């Protein structure tokens, strides 16, 4: 388990773009489960949408990418490096995410070849799938 301060030691993201609050389970280089508490105070809710606040789908996807980055950047040989989003496949948004929701973020690394890898991510709220995608990343 990692709190947000420990997460910040692994990935370079910071407010307002750090989208992982806590890691609840990690298998280095293989699998990570993390949480994002979605607050009404998130800066994106000011414009998306003031009368009907919904977390932008691309930010749910980014939260999954950050979760996957934790899995691979926590490996000793990758510490201090940065993970870059290189591609997205089979992405589907199935549920809106609103203030007060807790995103459960699960990413399993399904392939690594040198600095390029792919992860399968699923974001859920109360057991319902909000987003699923295959995420390709590059480590530099």
From Swiss-Prot:
GO terms for cellular component: cytoplasm; membrane. The active site is at residue 48. GO terms for molecular function: (3R)-hydroxyacyl-[acyl-carrier-protein] dehydratase activity. Pfam families: FabA. Keywords: Cytoplasm, Lipid A biosynthesis, Lipid biosynthesis, Lipid metabolism, Lyase. It is found in: Cytoplasm. The keyword Transcription does not apply. InterPro entries: FabA_FabZ (IPR013114), FabZ (IPR010084), HotDog_dom_sf (IPR029069). Its main location: cytoplasm. It comes from the Bacteria. Its EC number is 4.2.1.59. GO terms for biological process: fatty acid biosynthetic process; lipid A biosynthetic process. It catalyses: a (3R)-hydroxyacyl-[ACP] = a (2E)-enoyl-[ACP] + H2O. NCBIfam families: fabZ, PRK00006.1. Belongs to the thioester dehydratase family. FabZ subfamily. Involved in unsaturated fatty acids biosynthesis. Catalyzes the dehydration of short chain beta-hydroxyacyl-ACPs and long chain saturated and unsaturated beta-hydroxyacyl-ACPs. This is 3-hydroxyacyl-[acyl-carrier-protein] dehydratase FabZ. It comes from Oceanobacillus iheyensis (strain DSM 14371 / CIP 107618 / JCM 11309 / KCTC 3954 / HTE831). The gene is fabZ.
